[in-house]
Amino acid sequence: DMKISHTGSNGNLAEPEGVKIAPNGDTVYMTLQESNEMGWFSLSNPPDVLQDKVTYSNPIHEPDGIWVNSDGTLICTAGEYDGTIGVHSLDASGKPVTQRFIKMADDLPSNWDWEDKRKGIEPEEVVIAEAGDKTFVLTTLQDAGAVVVYDITDPAIPKYDSGAITDMND
């Protein structure tokens, strides 16, 4: 029974939001949305209290969805509060070593519109897809009812690929 009861550096209580098991089948990564952190632990040797965590360098990322690529070297997170996709490189031990953030507002078509002006672009979930020698991150946008795709083959230089509003809103 691992406890997650700490307060983040932003003063908010850590609350698990998204979870993904790494390809090694042992490391669990989770987003801690309100405390603006990501935590991880070993399934084979879970701690009593979550110890391995990192605070996002973007103070308003507040991650929701999370995905780990097939070789466990990259994690993407959906920044629900700030409208970004986090692209984070991992070292050989699985610890995050770089944090990059894709600001989707810079890339989305100007004719896209949705109702929630307070929150704006609100990514919920992310998936990393690999096709040939390319790596992509796909994210869903809650209020726009959209899916957005970025090429992250070079995580340092993400490129907007495509997006579509699904027209499934009420």
Predicted regions and their residues:
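Residue-level detector of Asp-centered blade-edge/turn motifs that repeat once per structural unit
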Residues: 23-25, 70-72, 130-134
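Conserved beta-strand position repeated across blades of beta-propeller domains
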Residues: 20, 67, 127-129
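Short loop/turn segments immediately following beta-strands, especially the blade-tip
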Residues: 40-48, 88-99, 150-158
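Structural signal for beta-propeller blades
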Residues: 36-38, 83-85, 145-147
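Short loop/turn segments immediately following the C-termini of beta-strands
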Residues: 33-34, 80-81, 140-143
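Surface-exposed loop and turn segments in beta-propeller and other repeat-based domains
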Residues: 1-11, 49-59, 93, 97-118, ...
